[in-house]
């Protein structure tokens, strides 16, 4: 009910024009399993990916294949933001402070940086805000951007760990 209210969905319209869950899951699968797709989101590994897995599981679709098959990769832009925040905040982003602590929530970063898309928890606006963050990091700190992007490659990550004398962990947990 909260998501319906937050997204201002009309239940009657959804019932009239929407898809049943299995058909919806198959449409999502067909898009997410396109070869060499980079599935990108903000805080997606901790939220969206889990929802997709559960949707697929309930509908007897392999819940993990979409993230690795056909050369696909999962990118969580929040990981880029965490790296930017932890290793020099000179990336062109302003990091908001909420209740005395830095906030890396997408809506707070969007407000602090005056992004055009301000309707939070709207999928299209969240996508625009995520894209804005990536464009800023890529233009201001291309090495950081490329380093973080490389972390989606298993071999790259393994080699970085094995070749390094110094290892950092940056995360929310």
Label the model's feature ranges.
Residues 16-27:
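Glycine-rich, highly charged phosphate/nucleotide-binding loops
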Residues 12-14:
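A short, conserved beta-strand element enriched in hydrophobic/aromatic residues
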């Amino acid at each position: 009910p909260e998501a319906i209210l937050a997204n201002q969905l009309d239940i009657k319209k959804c019932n009239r024009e929407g898809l049943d869950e299995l058909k919806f899951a198959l449409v999502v699968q067909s898009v997410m399993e396109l070869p060499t797709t980079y599935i990108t989101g903000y805080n997606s590994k901790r939220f969206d990916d889990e929802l997709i897995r559960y949707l697929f599981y309930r509908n007897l679709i392999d819940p993990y294949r979409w993230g690795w098959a056909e050369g696909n990769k999962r990118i969580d832009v929040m990981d880029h933001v965490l790296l930017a925040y932890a290793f020099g905040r000179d990336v062109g982003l302003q990091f908001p402070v909420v209740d005395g602590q830095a906030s890396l929530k997408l809506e707070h970063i969007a407000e602090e940086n005056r992004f055009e898309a301000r309707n939070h928890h709207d999928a299209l606006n969240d996508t625009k805000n995520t894209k804005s963050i990536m464009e800023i990091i890529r233009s201001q700190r291309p090495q950081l951007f490329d380093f973080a992007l490389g972390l989606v490659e298993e071999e790259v990550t393994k080699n970085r760990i094995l070749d390094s004398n110094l290892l950092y962990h940056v995360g929310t947990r």
